Amino acid sequence: MADQIRSATEGGDPTSDPKGFRRALGTFPTGVTIVTAPGVDGPAGVTANSFASVSLDPPLVLWSIGHTSRSHSKFQQSATFAINILADDQVGVSQVFAGGSADKFSLVDWHTGRTGAPLIDNALAYFDCVCEARHEGGDHTIMIGRVVDFGRAEGSPLAFSQGRYGVTLDHPEAAKARDHKSEEYGLDDLPFLSLIAKAHYKEDADLEEQRSAAGCTPVGSKILAGLYGSAPLTADELARRMYLDRREVVDSLNEFVADGHVESCDSGRFALTESGKQRRRRMIEYVSRYQDEQLASISRSDLGVATRVLQAFLAGPGRGSS
């Protein structure tokens, strides 16, 4: 049973509050896919989190594309498409296809699949499909594909929830069960990465209370941080810098502009107003107090050691290095 009772902070008729409706939909975490198709005038590719399996026999999958997408006509005309599931080190690939570049495929490595659809190099998995059916669903077209070829690599998926990229980690309750099992075998020390994950869970939950009290969403908080002390940035630059979904960034920027916390500058760039800077400074002050409280019982020498260990970890060779 959950220890915390949750009450809705927004709700109602989705037609009168489409942004709130989209935020509610965004609470469901998904993976991140790039859907591709061949074309006479060049391949098409879009990011999509609407991917789902439909059937094992026959092997069917589906995804959907908005009618206003610039690639909609290409996918309507193509008899094939491929769904590429991104790994957790492919945020950059996702951002390329979510952005407005005219020649996205020149910015990533790819090869041609069995059906002629592009397959993204180093993707965690792919499903190469022939289009089985198309159905209209509101402002989207639902594409059903029959999988004729697939592939899977070892690794972890890139995740997406509430406008933010993420990674998959074991739940703390699962970690507790694993720790208990470790004790049975005399393995008393917690794995280093497990400790980092638990510290992140605690910090994020504690700071979420302050964000909510200030009326700021997680995406909004990151936008304030990204603009604070920075030259004016575009929505695309903010999304890349803070690892956020561009659409969520645009929505939050519009709300901040309406509230007077952000101002629109030349060339589609945005900057914090004095009100926005004050709001960010209040958050910094709270985080500083929170840090002091959490670390009060830890000696300066131990903090120094922990800091150096984490800095060395962050500066390490990274995934896939030999």
UniProtKB/Swiss-Prot annotation:
Pfam families according to UniProt: Flavin_Reduct
SUPFAM superfamilies for this protein: FMN-binding split barrel, Winged helix' DNA-binding domain
InterPro entries documented for this protein: Flavin_Rdtase-like_dom, NADH-dep_flavin_reductase, Split_barrel_FMN-bd, WH-like_DNA-bd_sf, WH_DNA-bd_sf
Uppermost EC category: oxidoreductase
Keyword NAD on entry: yes
Region Disordered: start-end pairs: 1-20
Entry's Gene Ontology molecular function annotations: FMN binding; FMN reductase (NADH) activity; riboflavin reductase (NADPH) activity
Keyword match NAD: yes
Reactions it catalyzes: FMNH2 + NAD(+) = FMN + NADH + 2 H(+)
Keywords: Flavoprotein, FMN, NAD, Oxidoreductase
EC id: 1.5.1.42
Quaternary state and interactors: Heterodimer of two subunits, A and B.
Family: Belongs to the non-flavoprotein flavin reductase family.
Its job: Catalyzes the NADH-dependent reduction of the FMN cofactor of the nitrilotriacetate monooxygenase subunit A.
PANTHER family, alphabetized: FLAVIN REDUCTASE, FLAVIN-DEPENDENT MONOOXYGENASE, REDUCTASE SUBUNIT HSAB
Protein name in UniProt: FMN reductase (NADH) NtaB
